[in-house]
Amino acid sequence: KQIGLGSSSGTIDTMHSTSATQSTGRTLDLAIDGDGYFRIDTGDGTAYTRAGNFYLDNTGTLVTGDGYHVLNMNGGTIKIPTDAQSFTIGSDGKVSIVDAGGQSQDGGQIGIVTFANSDGLDKIGSNLYRESLNSGTASAANQPGDGGTGSLKVGFLEMSNVDLTDEFTEMIVAQRGFQSNSKIITTSDEILQELVNLKR
């Protein structure tokens, strides 16, 4: 005879709150200080991320660590000529390039989008999300700091928003609960054994 249904996980929630940033000094490291997501072209649709550790591929295109293209305000890619002398990214997301001839060029602008319900985004791995019915559609791309989006910090990365103190506390509480339940089972077994012995 089975008594009870055991235990199972309910929901797994993702915390979308902002966290502290850490300076890296690297031009392609970008952190959103506030609400918002970068738009990413995965090849089979648009995804969204807050992870701003970007790179340049062999064609000079701005990509994620997995090689997905980072999109600009207009939904296009951002490309730095491979022979450019230098480039910078401003806090407004604008990419400025000094080409091989020493001339300044506009490299486009990184846009940030927001959602009515970020908690409703679907996780697809590699710190990427897709919009869902629960999240609503993404807003139009905004310049960082506009339209309710957070500002852009260049040369910084957002750290984990996990509170280790809270997590350790919850783990200890769960461990104590498990130990108490184990003790109850042991005591119940002992009582049943005593009853069996009395019957004999």
Features from the language model and the residues they span:
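Amphipathic alpha-helical polymerization modules
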Residues: 1-200
